[in-house]
């Protein structure tokens, strides 16, 4: 199961949170879901060069809060915040609601699977050999602290007549372990021979449940924590 399913979806509610945070009844659910898709598509197309990894959307009444996770916040914000203000107005026109935009910087782009996948796709479009592109990103990610990485390219690789999939990996990528923090990204490269799909899995370590401290245990159970009671 872990080998086939999207690792992000499998871990939602366990170690990952939802990217859309809102509630709607049956009548409005489809319309709001389509609105989310439109917002994400618009931002990705408008800020293609900014290295957008993910877009979180929160809703409350007639207000929409959009959080953009980007490797290049300067491009999104612009001089004196002009670009982000322009983006906010365009999103308000698109949705007809009050929109606030929050920019979140990605400190280490080499550990973000979506950005790594888009990087490989961009190299393939520049006619760089797919094996070289894969080995480069794998090497960079491991140097920046990844515990493991797997990159797969599928399609008419190097212009071959028959499509195939090739992959390159380093370290370990435990897809079945639900506490494993595995990031997944997918991108497409439009080459002269057709589309080439790029998939990236990055293992960033385990997310362990919060350790129960004696003080917390005492507060919940109404008992004194060890070492705190009087003689």
UniProtKB/Swiss-Prot annotation:
BP term (GO), one: translation
Entry keyword annotation includes rRNA-binding: yes
Gene Ontology molecular-function annotations: mRNA binding; rRNA binding; structural constituent of ribosome
GO cellular component, one term: cytosolic small ribosomal subunit
Gene3D superfamilies reported for this sequence: 3.30.300.20, Ribosomal protein S3, C-terminal domain
UniProt-listed InterPro entries: KH_dom, KH_dom-like_a/b, KH_dom_type_2, KH_sf_prok-type, Ribosomal_S3_C_sf, Ribosomal_uS3_bac-typ, Ribosomal_uS3_C, Ribosomal_uS3_CS
Location of the KH type-2 domain: 39-107
Assembly behavior: Part of the 30S ribosomal subunit. Forms a tight complex with proteins S10 and S14.
Name the record gives this protein: Small ribosomal subunit protein uS3
Gene: rpsC
């Amino acid at each position: 199961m872990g080998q086939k399913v999207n690792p992000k979806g499998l871990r939602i509610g366990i170690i990952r949170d939802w990217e859309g945070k809102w509630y709607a009844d049956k009548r409005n659910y489809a319309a709001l879901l389509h609105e989310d898709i439109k917002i994400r598509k618009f931002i990705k197309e408008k800020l293609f060069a900014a290295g957008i990894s993910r877009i979180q959307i929160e809703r409350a009444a007639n207000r929409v809060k959009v959080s953009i996770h980007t490797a290049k916040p300067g491009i999104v914000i612009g001089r004196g915040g002009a670009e982000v203000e322009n983006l906010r107005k365009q999103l308000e026109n698109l949705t007809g609601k009050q929109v606030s935009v929050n920019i979140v910087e990605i400190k280490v782009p080499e550990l973000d699977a979506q950005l790594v996948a888009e990087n490989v796709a961009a190299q393939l479009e520049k006619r760089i050999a797919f094996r070289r592109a894969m080995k480069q990103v794998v090497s960079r990610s491991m140097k920046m602290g990844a515990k493991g990485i797997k990159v797969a390219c599928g399609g008419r690789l190097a212009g071959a007549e028959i499509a195939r999939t090739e992959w390159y990996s380093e370290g370990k990528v435990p897809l079945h372990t639900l506490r494993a923090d595995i990031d997944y990204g997918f991108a497409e490269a439009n080459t002269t021979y057709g589309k080439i799909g790029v998939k990236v899995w990055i293992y960033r370590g385990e997310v362990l449940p919060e350790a129960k401290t004696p003080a917390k245990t005492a507060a919940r159970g109404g008992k004194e924590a060890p070492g705190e009671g009087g003689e």
